[in-house]
């Protein structure tokens, strides 16, 4: 089921979310199609909502190459690990943790096969969803060093915020209407 169909199932209280999604997708001027749909896919995966993730992957396959779709998945997977690890370092009052090696494999960050700016945008979007300030700062810095402007960065975060909200509404509706969730 495409995301547009999922959007039709959102209740009235999510009207702003629906309108924001429509505007972001149909009137996007800042992001390339690959940047937009990679951000949608990576962000949907980060919400952990099955319905939204399946819809985003379906739509993503229409707009992204297989390699870009896989790279968006890589960004979501690696950030789900890194965001926890580096958020812990950031939040812990024990400064020693920040000096210790991560010892976590992250080869996908180098071997994803898409434009580095695109992959960084997707990583930034997932990091914003997962609330890792250290990761947000790191990815934003790399993006700026690669020539990305604040408008591009904020456009990706805007997409992430709306996708996250869609996932939250879908989860709330599962709880509100358990019989629908079982179908």
Curated annotation (Swiss-Prot):
Q: Which Gene3D superfamilies match?
A: AhpD-like
* One Gene Ontology molecular-function label: hydroperoxide reductase activity
> Where are the catalytic residues?
132, 135
Q: What class of enzyme is it?
A: oxidoreductase
Q: Does the keyword Oxidoreductase apply?
A: yes
Superkingdom of source: Bacteria
Q: Which Pfam families match?
A: CMD (PF02627)
Q: Which UniProt keywords apply?
A: Antioxidant, Disulfide bond, Oxidoreductase, Peroxidase, Redox-active center
- Protein EC: 1.11.1.28
Which GO BP terms sit in this record?
cell redox homeostasis; response to oxidative stress
Q: What is the catalytic activity of this protein?
A: N(6)-[(R)-dihydrolipoyl]-L-lysyl-[lipoyl-carrier protein] + a hydroperoxide = N(6)-[(R)-lipoyl]-L-lysyl-[lipoyl-carrier protein] + an alcohol + H2O
Q: List the disulfide bonds.
A: 132-135
Family per similarity comment: Belongs to the AhpD family.
Q: Which purpose does this protein serve, as stated in its record?
A: Antioxidant protein with alkyl hydroperoxidase activity. Required for the reduction of the AhpC active site cysteine residues and for the regeneration of the AhpC enzyme activity.
Per its record, how is this protein called by name? Alkyl hydroperoxide reductase AhpD
Organism encoding this protein: Acidobacterium capsulatum (strain ATCC 51196 / DSM 11244 / BCRC 80197 / JCM 7670 / NBRC 15755 / NCIMB 13165 / 161)
Q: What is the lineage of its organism?
A: Bacteria, Pseudomonadati, Acidobacteriota, Terriglobia, Terriglobales
